[in-house]
Amino acid sequence: MAQWACPLWQGLDQIDIALQQAQARWPALGSDTRHAITMSGEMVDAFEHREEGVQRIADRLAQVLRGEVRLYGGDLGWIAPADAARCWTQIASANWLATAHHAATVFRDGLLVDIGSTTTDLIVLANGRVQTASRSDHERLASGELVYHGVVRTPLCALARHVAFRGPPVNVMNEWFATTADVYRMTGELDPAHDQQPSADARSKDRTATRQRPARMIGLDARDAEDDEWLALAKAWRQAQIEEIAASLTRMMATRCGITSAGTIVTAGCGAFLVPDLAARVPALTGWPLRSYGCDVARIAATDDGAADASKADWAQVCAPSVAVASLYAQEPC
């Protein structure tokens, strides 16, 4: 498993660059390779609309990849690139659904919480099924099942209008001075392997620069406070993000839950480290055990004694949609 940054808003050639890196990593990929694909890149502003995005991404992948190519279409199953235009609504941003479908094959009742670099998915699983009628990003934003919060790319000004610093709350500048990656770099929770996006100012991610960016959010510089004060500020931002996600989760569980007894919380994404504190803030989740997508759903990379290989399980956790489509396609190819 591997992932590469793909700033698709800069043009379709970014797909080619990412695929070249994949080919270098796995040079044996050839005409006998089967490719199971899900996407979310159709939303970028390089495309006039999402339909165009799905079709152009599908076309480019079909041109570049050798071997069989199939697109995950959720309830429609597997779709050939030639049919992408006709089925674009099912293909668009269906990555969350693949992860949820795969998780539901293992945990019949529960909740998938996938906190990634940019977004958070909150999906109820009931009776071995994905318990939501929502399919599009718009529908999931309306229901609260999609929260546009992640642990890498989210601007800090999107988390809160004010934040505690040296006592009373301080109003926050509505500027793209810093992102959540700075926060979780400061707290030590963000794995450097998953810190793939440029910083807000395109400068270093070292200790000083990482503090300078959040400092700007409250009108200061890194030199204006001590290390423990900047760590306290990072923790305040962290708490603000947890509260925002918890508010959506509380509303969603009150109105959309089809589970009558305690279920299992399945964690996924590079921000899975937030889930224990998040769950603790939602009364409806009291007593629900936490399980990892990488270890308990993907179940890949087991060692001889049956235990999960920690490194590969971590990557499966972060790359959950990719692992999910590969697993689902292996179980039920078209």
Where are these regions (language model features)?
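Nucleotide/phosphate-binding catalytic cleft detector across ATP-hydrolyzing
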Residues: 2-113, 123-334
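Glycine-rich anion/phosphate-binding loop at the beta-strand->alpha-helix junction
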Residues: 118-122
